[in-house]
Design a protein with these regions (language model features):
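Extracellular beta-rich ligand/substrate-recognition surface
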Residues: 5-12
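Short Gly/Pro-enriched turn/cap motifs at secondary-structure boundaries
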Residues: 7, 19-20, 52-58, 108-113, ...
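Glycine-rich beta-strand-centered segment in the early N-terminal region that forms part
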Residues: 22-35, 48-93, 133-136
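Short, solvent-exposed secondary-structure boundary/capping segments
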Residues: 42, 74, 102-106
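NAD(P)H dinucleotide-binding glycine-rich loop of Rossmann-like/cofactor-binding domains
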Residues: 89-145
Length: 145
């Protein structure tokens, strides 16, 4: 699949990488429909010390569920979903108290090596994926962007 990486400060490029796979029972594989460029992406983009090939973070996306892990009960293949920027595991003390942005398992990562790609693996999907009614074709381009 294609994925964006930084090639140098102020420049990104496409590389071919392996399509992500289900690794845990509560994983979901999403086919990315839209993603955006966030301020934190721009920090790396503008960094003069960025290493060529460094993964482009990208952490906001909407997509279609392609595959689900055996523990997934909240979505099914074909569902249109939001993959939120920050999400928790749903199991730790912080998540159970309603503070999933400070999840005990979410230390220095968004559980993704970048969503500016054709597919992504989304962890803890039962807790955090947000199902959207309908399919992308039900929405105008302006609504999707």
């Amino acid at each position: 699949m294609k994925k964006t990486v930084y090639t140098k400060a102020g420049q990104v490029g496409l590389v071919e990488v392996e399509r992500p796979q289900i690794e845990a029972p509560d994983d979901v594989i999403l086919r990315i429909v839209r993603t955006c460029v966030c301020g934190s992406d721009l920090w790396s983009y503008r960094n003069p010390d960025i290493e060529a090939g460094h993964q482009n973070s990208g952490h906001e996306a909407i997509g279609i569920v392609e595959e689900i892990g055996e523990a997934i009960t909240t979505v099914k293949p074909g569902d249109f979903v939001i993959a939120p920027f920050t999400h928790g595991c749903g199991e730790c003390d912080a998540c159970r108290a309603g503070y999933d942005g400070t999840c005990d398992r979410h230390i220095g990562t968004n559980w993704s090596d970048g969503v500016q790609a054709e597919y992504m693996r989304f962890e803890y999907a039962n807790w955090a994926l947000v199902k959207i009614p309908g399919q992308p074709s039900d929405y105008t381009e302006a609504m999707l962007k």
